[in-house]
Amino acid sequence: MIRDAKFFWGVGAICLLAFIAIAILTDQIFEHVPHSEDEVAYVFQAKVFAQYRLAVPTPLNDQAFWTPFVVDFNGLRFGKYAPGWPLLLSLGIRLNAPWLVNALLGTLTLALIA
């Protein structure tokens, strides 16, 4: 199937609108805050990865800093989930815009589907 320039401009416009919609929803509805315990663990691990580390030392009073789905083991604290998503999210953390990762991935997915 041969696609003309109008098609690609249309896809580009839809992707741009999707990116803007995701950015507005992230800002106005979700307020750039993780809303589930899973998300908190992902953001924690992404912040650790953004420091070029795999784990951080456990705080002295670890019970006061308990976080669901974050593991304290042998004096180290790390997320319990696979590192793929936190590693991608760490790129956004380094840019001080973690919301950008979801917006770009959503837009890329939309473009690939078209």
What are these regions (language model features)?
Residues 12, 74-78, 97, 101:
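Solvent-exposed loop and edge beta-strand segments that line ligand/cofactor-binding
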